Amino acid sequence: LKGLARIDLLQRVEPIGGKGGRKALWHIKDNLFRFWYRFIGPRRAMIERGMGDMAVPAIEQGLPLFMGPVFETMCRDWLWRECAAGSLDFPMTDVGCWWGNDPKERSQAEIDIVAVDGSTTTLVGECKWRGEPTDVDQLRKLDARAWLAGAGAQTPRWLFSKSAYTDACKAFALNLPSARLVAFEEMVR
């Protein structure tokens, strides 16, 4: 694995604030390779025999799930861009994701975006790449899990979405002073 990391094909990822060890995961770093191994490789014989159009429905069906991690990376990159432009209301020296045990729920939990300044959590975020508007449940879940990544009550909670937000989500965000809804359209301006 380390050899593949040296040539930039794989990336070792740890939860932000992690000390290394058993929680680290390995990911294919290049999205072109991820796409190939997820969609093209399993259908290669079909495609090589001129039946590529028969592979399209399976690719279209799997694309939203494939795009989830891609969108998370886009959101983290956007935060770095905003940080460089001086547009953030909080300091940030690193940004990543967090995963681990949720002792309240007795299950595994993940937070897509965690920004830190040294050892202080300065932002938590959730990223949703879906075709329908993002619902209030996603913001509630983020708010409930924020403490797992060291966030306090005033730590910003940002919900990133490819699509719009439901009215219930917008209303909840208005009543949660630390919340911000970031649409994909805003990120690509």
Task: Tell me the role of every PLM-derived stretch.
Residues 1-3:
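Amphipathic alpha-helical scaffolds
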Residues 5-17:
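A short, conserved structural fragment
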Residues 15-16, 20, 24-189:
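A cross-kingdom feature that marks ATP-driven nucleic-acid transaction machinery
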